């Protein structure tokens, strides 16, 4: 076990686990295959977090880290983490995790002029570049993080989707950005905790069949924040602490909302705004 004033790190189930107390209620869990990397997060606010007092002990079977509010118990043989209240009562179990190496690629024309094919679909006109070629950027991983939820536990969150699902238990949900889909890599539980994944790629939530897990399409490592807020307000408070306060949108983002595929010129957009303001539509 490696212990500093900021984190503890150990090897479990052939991978590296680092547990980092952010507050007494929030613990960051990073799982790497060969190393734990620093990352420039696009989700977590960049600021200095004060040091948190914690205790950590390791024996042949497990590592335990404890703050004033949360106890994390990591089983070394399996990588299973029990997330508990400080008094030992359990919130949930992160059952296991796996990382599979992949090539991270981008698509480029290689300097050629793009060959664009315009196709009319039920969602409007789509532009497809025909001469894109894959180019490897770096090595990465596909990941799965398994959870063992209680039978009556409800799972909410994951952003905005079209299906109208309130409780995701027993469901499969794809988290990707689209016209009417606004995914968020966060779920909250009726048991009084939340889990925020620091992941900007495609994700899948799966609670069908015999296994429950979240799939992460492209990551350097598994990186999530366990938030033991006890109440929904407490979880949202922890989420805001990590990601920053909710921002007020500019004036043009409020009022009448149009369902429109796209505007082709800035002049067209400005004319639409001028017309709506002229006729008194806010």
Each predicted region: which residue ranges?
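Short, intrinsically disordered, charge-balanced linker/junction segments flanking boundaries
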Residues: 278-282
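N-terminal accessory segment at the very beginning of proteins
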Residues: 1-253, 258-274
